[in-house]
Regions:
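Membrane-anchoring hydrophobic helices of lipid-metabolizing enzymes
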Residues: 2-101, 111-113, 120-122, 164, ...
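Non-catalytic C-terminal accessory region of glycerolipid acyltransferases
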Residues: 15, 25, 159-296
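Catalytic core of membrane glycerolipid acyltransferases/transacylases, capturing the structured
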Residues: 51, 99-155
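Short, conserved catalytic or adaptor-binding loops enriched in Gly and charged residues
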Residues: 72-76, 136-137, 247-250
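Short, flexible loop segments at the rims of nucleotide/cofactor-binding pockets, characterized by
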Residues: 75-80, 104, 151-156, 193-195
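Residue-level "edge-of-site" marker
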Residues: 88, 131, 221
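Glycine-rich, often proline-containing surface loops adjacent to acidic residues and nearby aromatics
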Residues: 94-99, 141, 256-258
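Generic beta-strand structural signal
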Residues: 98, 123-126, 142, 165, ...
Length: 296
């Protein structure tokens, strides 16, 4: 692709080693049966292998005296070939309120690659993400947790994260959001149709309008396996358990990222929230061009 370059992510500070493991979607607050079910599928589908790769690469960095970020270490451990247009990333606003919006086809890989890119473009970024990932101490400084449990505590966490996101933008910072909240899924029970994001949260548009922020659209081509698509229609626990299977499938693979042109708030000032949300989604999926993901 013309102008596209493969970049190695720039090392950044990382905290001391820890025994805490971010390599599971089983929430300690879930019922025992649910944690066991998710954990069993994860063990069978490669979570331990991925954790071992990460820990080995992390230890290499400490032995060599390198200070790598969690995101850089994860990309290196998985041998991901992250491909993107470096010129477009450089053109992203380096200061001032900026909302980065993206589709969510894979899961944790979307977040890891996105954060690695933002370390280069906007070191002041925060990302709204699944609260389960807060178990990784290396990620906590960047994360604004979103809890999907239907509890008062989850509601409290989500309200606080949204308030922090708005405050950060109003202070001139950058916030990353995957407005679908959940990973893209094929509407077909047999996974024959392309996976696509579900309905986007209006909060993405609210962030832009309330903070008078610019927007940077990013599109991740591709989708998870047909097995994942089928499992998603069978049971949510089976779906959760397969996320690390999907990560393992992509070890050593190209990981293309389509970066759009940033737009200033003036381009959206006249739009109401509903229209803006539709426009934001169109900006992201408009980067797909003719390369639509196909089930594999």
């Amino acid at each position: 692709m013309g102008g596209r370059q493969t970049r190695v992510m720039t090392p950044a500070m990382t905290p001391e080693p820890t025994d805490d493991s971010p390599f599971s979607y089983a929430d300690p607050g879930d019922p025992l049966w649910k944690r066991l079910a998710i954990g069993m599928v994860e063990r069978l589908s490669g979570a331990r292998h991925i954790e071992r790769l990460y820990r080995e690469k992390q230890a290499e960095g400490w032995r060599d005296g390198e200070q790598r970020s969690f995101f850089h270490t994860a990309i290196s451990a998985l041998s991901l070939d992250v491909q993107y247009d470096a010129d477009r990333l450089v053109r992203a606003p380096s200061q001032g309120p900026l909302v980065v919006v993206a589709n969510h086809p894979f899961g944790v890989l979307d977040g890891i690659v996105m954060c690695a890119l933002m370390e280069r473009a906007r070191p002041d970024f925060l990302v709204l993400t699944n609260s389960v990932l807060m178990r990784a101490p290396e990620m906590r400084a960047r994360m604004l947790p979103v809890d999907f449990a239907e509890t008062r505590e989850a509601q409290r966490i989500n309200v606080a994260s949204r308030a922090k996101a708005l405050d950060h933008l109003k202070d001139g910072g950058c916030v990353v959001i995957f407005p679908a909240g959940a990973v893209s899924t094929s509407p077909d029970w047999l996974g024959r149709q392309p996976a696509i994001d579900g309905a986007w949260s209006p909060f993405a548009a609210r962030l832009v309008l309330s903070a008078r922020a610019g927007v940077l659209p990013i599109y991740f081509p591709g989708q998870n396996s047909r097995l994942f698509q089928i499992a998603s229609h069978i049971h949510p626990n089976l779906r959760l358990g397969l996320f690390f299977h999907e990560v393992r499938r992509r070890i050593g693979a190209p990981f293309p990222v389509e970066i759009g042109e940033a737009a200033t708030f003036d381009a959206f000032a006249h739009l109401d929230r509903a229209v803006l949300l539709t426009h934001l989604r169109a900006l992201v999926y408009g980067l797909a061009g003719d390369a639509q993901p196909r089930p594999r």
